[in-house]
UniProtKB/Swiss-Prot annotation:
This protein's record includes keyword Repeat: yes
Pfam families named in the record: F-box, FBA_1
Annotated S-S bridges: none
Domain F-box: 1-46
PROSITE patterns: FBOX
Protein name, entry field: Putative F-box/kelch-repeat protein At3g19410
Intervals holding Kelch repeats: 101-148, 149-200, 329-373
Domain of life assignment: Eukaryota
Keywords noted in UniProt: Kelch repeat, Repeat
Length: 373
């Protein structure tokens, strides 16, 4: 008895709910599915909207990008770093680029190097698609980049924002036109802080800024190319420690320590009102209040991840072990006893941890010259 084939539309509808990492395994089983997963922007958008999000904790340094497996179920938390790091050596076009920083937005990674002339690569690790972004011949020292996106007419458009901390020099890169253009000051009356403390949530970039009165949080909207202030849980002229993270692509999380004698607090957003164009309406809840050992001094911009349900954070901490020699140690800290468990030591420069969610999203190529990854 011949089994009837299911209608194509029904098959696509079923596949839209299958997590992205499982779809990758199915690519080799059928040429039609391979084309659907790899080349069909319509299906990629539909899958992005409907499929359950997977979150893969990643650790990056200037040398490699590794997946991690975190175990919080035992009496002592543990972490396993996958043996095989994700490197660009599998792509001969970009194997000579040493990555110094990675920024995640909407399933894509923006990777750039500050060694000599700046190189930028936008990369989808799931599909292996890449695009090399060329920068204009300008001052490279101190230049920073973030990736963001917005939706219009049921399509998703990505842009790159370029900025410096020491000047009011801002540019936008348009993927479709393959070109850079100058834009107006995105933070009038403010100065941006901590270039490595920017995060992307739902396409918008959040970053710290400061004026004469207090430290602020800004949301940069790539659709309007403007920013609005986001009130922090409380105001302060300065903080002993401050850092920013994203919780499961749904909430912002901020680490605050007012002064040396204060507890280290982790807050998350309950509500973010996206409709305002002046000052965002935000409510915060305090998830953790940690009384840490003086030996574990949290500094500005330490990269961290929060497990809101288990009330646990994973955070990097740079420590001087010997004269002129430092190590970055990764700790897991819980609310039950404030105990910090060291789970990993790394020697690479500028380590960071973040949650990556695999996606079939395709990298928009230039309309003037179609590039092949």
């Amino acid at each position: 008895m011949t089994i009837p084939e299911l209608p194509k539309d029904l098959i696509e509808e079923i596949l839209c709910y299958v997590p992205a990492t499982y779809l990758k395994r199915l690519r080799s089983t059928c040429k039609g599915w391979n084309r659907l997963f790899k080349d069909d922007r319509r299906f990629a958008k539909k899958h992005y909207d409907k499929a359950a999000k997977q979150f893969l904790p990643l650790m990056s340094t200037n040398e490699e990008l590794c997946a991690m497996s975190v175990n919080l179920h035992g009496t002592i938390p543990s972490l396993e770093v996958k043996d095989k790091p994700w490197l660009f050596v599998s792509d001969s076009k970009h194997c000579d680029i040493e990555i110094s920083r990675i920024f995640h937005s909407g399933g894509l990674l923006l990777c750039f190097s500050r060694d000599g002339e700046i190189s930028i690569i936008v990369w989808n690790p799931l599909t292996s698609e890449t695009r090399l972004i060329r920068t204009r011949n300008r001052r490279d020292k101190g230049r920073n980049f973030v990736l963001g996106y917005y939706q219009e007419d049921k399509k998703t458009y990505y842009k790159i924002l370029s900025f410096y901390l020491d000047s009011k020099d801002f540019e936008i890169f348009e993927f479709n036109s393959d070109s850079w253009r100058f834009i107006d000051d995105i933070c009038p009356g403010l100065s941006l802080l901590y270039s490595d403390q920017c995060v992307s949530l739902k396409g918008n970039t959040y970053m710290f800024a400061i004026d004469d009165l207090s430290v602020s949080l800004l949301k940069y909207d790539f659709s309007t190319e403007t920013s609005v202030p986001v009130p922090l849980p409380y105001k302060s002229r300065s903080f002993e420690a401050i850092s920013l993270s994203v919780v499961r692509e749904e909430k912002l999380s901020v680490l605050l320590q007012r002064d040396k004698s204060s507890k280290t607090e982790i807050w998350v957003t309950n509500v973010i009102d996206e409709t305002t164009t002046k000052v965002m309406v935000v409510s915060w809840s305090k998830v953790l209040s940690l009384d840490l050992s003086p030996d574990l001094k949290i500094r500005y911009g330490e990269s961290f991840l929060l497990d809101e349900e288990k009330k646990v954070i994973m955070i990097f901490n740079n420590r001087m072990e010997e004269e002129n020699k430092s190590e970055d140690k990764l700790y897991i800290i819980g609310d039950d006893d404030n105990k910090a468990t060291q789970v990993y030591t790394i020697h690479g420069y500028g380590p960071a941890v973040f949650n990556y969610f695999p996606s079939l999203v395709q990298i928009e190529q230039s309309s003037r010259q179609e590039e092949k990854s």
